[in-house]
């Protein structure tokens, strides 16, 4: 059986990247929350 997680840098960035997050109000809220918490990584590098 094939495993469910098949890593791909492209897909990772396109779905969870910083710019994708900033496109929607909800995504921007996620970034704000992570900034407030003091996260070093706000989105996917």
Curated annotation (Swiss-Prot):
Q: Coiled coil where?
A: none
Biological process according to GO? translation
Query: Which Pfam family, any one of them, does this sequence belong to?
Result: Ribosomal_L34
One example GO MF annotation: structural constituent of ribosome
According to the record, the signal peptide region is none
Quote the cellular component terms of the Gene Ontology held in the record.
Answer: ribonucleoprotein complex; ribosome
UniProt keywords (A-Z) are: Ribonucleoprotein, Ribosomal protein
Gene3D superfamilies membership: 1.10.287.3980
Q: Cell membrane: present as a keyword of the record?
A: no
| Keyword Nucleotide-binding applies | no
Name the NCBIfam families on file: rpmH_bact (TIGR01030)
| Family to which the UniProt record says this protein belongs | Belongs to the bacterial ribosomal protein bL34 family.
HAMAP family from the UniProt entry: Ribosomal_bL34
Q: What is this protein called?
A: Large ribosomal subunit protein bL34
Source organism per entry reads Nitrosospira multiformis (strain ATCC 25196 / NCIMB 11849 / C 71)
């Amino acid at each position: 059986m094939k495993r469910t997680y098949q890593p791909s840098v492209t897909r990772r960035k396109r779905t969870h990247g910083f710019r994708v997050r900033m496109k929607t109000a909800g995504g921007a809220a996620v970034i704000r929350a992570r900034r407030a918490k003091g996260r070093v990584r706000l989105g996917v590098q």
